[in-house]
Amino acid sequence: RLLGVRLETVAIEAPFKGFLEALSPLFNGLEPGIAEENLQSRCRGALMMALSNKFGGLLLTTGNKSEYAVGYATIYGDMCGGFGPIKDLYKTEVQALCRWRNARSPAIPE
């Protein structure tokens, strides 16, 4: 509200379960791991892209330079989008930017 943006919640459980069901014959007997974790992120990315397409928006990626440097990002998941506004900032710089913004009036949660 303070940022002037609309906030909605879209559940990923149904598409995630659908993907798991489709993959279950191939994943049968294997321990859950990174594939399932990445699949959750990819479900979010697909849903966000659908909203972006439907309403004519540009989906922004959320990754920063620190995350990309250590591989802490999921292709077609949190890297899904048309522009990365914080892609060239290290995590410490993102945190400093949030503190600077909140000093004016709190809008970004710690």
Predicted regions mapped to residue ranges:
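ATP-dependent adenylation/nucleotidyltransferase module used to activate substrates
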Residues: R1-S66, C98
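Mid-to-C-terminal catalytic subdomains of enzymes
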Residues: G57-L59, N64-E110
